[in-house]
UniProtKB/Swiss-Prot annotation:
Pfam families noted in UniProt: CheB_methylest (PF01339), Response_reg (PF00072)
Region annotation (Disordered) ranges: 132-154
Transmembrane intervals: none
HAMAP family in the cross-refs: CheB_chemtxs
Domain CheB-type methylesterase, first and last residues per copy: 152-346
Family to which this protein belongs: Belongs to the CheB family.
Domain Response regulatory: 3-119
Organism: Halobacterium salinarum (strain ATCC 29341 / DSM 671 / R1)
Residue numbers bearing the 4-aspartylphosphate modification: D53
Signal peptide: none
Catalytic activity: [protein]-L-glutamate 5-O-methyl ester + H2O = L-glutamyl-[protein] + methanol + H(+); L-glutaminyl-[protein] + H2O = L-glutamyl-[protein] + NH4(+)
A GO MF label: phosphorelay response regulator activity
Protein name in UniProt: Protein-glutamate methylesterase/protein-glutamine glutaminase
Amino acid sequence: MTEALVVDDSHFMRTVISDILEDGGVDVVGTAENGARALDAVTDVQPDVITMDVEMPEMDGIEATAEIMREQPTPILMVSALTTEDADATLEAMEKGAIDTFAKPGGTISTELSGHSEELVAAVERVASADPTAGHDVEMEPASPPDATTSEYADNPTLLIGASTGGPNVVESILASLPAEADFRVLIVQHMPDQFTSRFADRLDAASQYDITEAEDGSRIGGGEGLVARGDYHMRVSGYSNGRLRVRLDQSERLHSVRPAIDVTFKSAAERVTDPLVSVVLTGMGSDGADGVRAVKDAGGATLAQNEATSAVFGIPERAIETGCVDDVLPVDQLTEAIADSIRRTT
């Protein structure tokens, strides 16, 4: 049975979360009202997973996450309100080592959480299975610039990135090291709640030489630009011409129980994009992305996957690899170089 530590400054929320987890078959072995108490509790009860509030007195969730990852790495699920402030703080906590996030419906003191019991239990179990040390503090190998006499980048390439649990840091690392001269159009699908994807796009934009924004219905991008799929919306490539692509957003049925789905974006890109196409699937649980990788491969695109050793959860890459359509499986620090290599051409 999975053993959990529940950390929240609200006694009400500690009780609600604990009851939901216990009813769902998770053993709550301890609770704490702030980050400082959480540090002691982690040592005492050694849980499999921690649910961590963001805003708490004495020591908040960001500080606590950083300390826990330094002293006793443990999978952490950030449980935060759907606010801009909490979204920023949660993404910072994930940068410090938290694995994933669960959005409290209705605010910091959520009376609606019991209506999302199954989702919370599933998130806790998913995070408990993650390797909290995989892929952190990675120094990306920068892509080598093309040799002016022997090679150059192909024209109008498109890069597709799909990720779930443990993905935000990896996506940011790839974007931060992606060479501007490659001039990719970038489409990113990260399983993440609405309200969070806008802030995630802002972080990627700040870290990258590419102009990254959250997708809107009808968004168009060209070289050097990228879109993050909006939370709770599928992102489909609806048109492609002269190196510019257009996307449409919709709230059609969830695929693999998620929206946005990696497969929706990858398959639509494979159908529409007529110039070089590269896909990479990263850490996460489930099979989303496998069909999309197959579609990209069938369309003549390059396909890459993150390896098990650097994946917090290896489900998504593993399912894609099992299709037989993945060209290369690499540690996270080698992915940017491989992405760039896939569009080099000899002159």
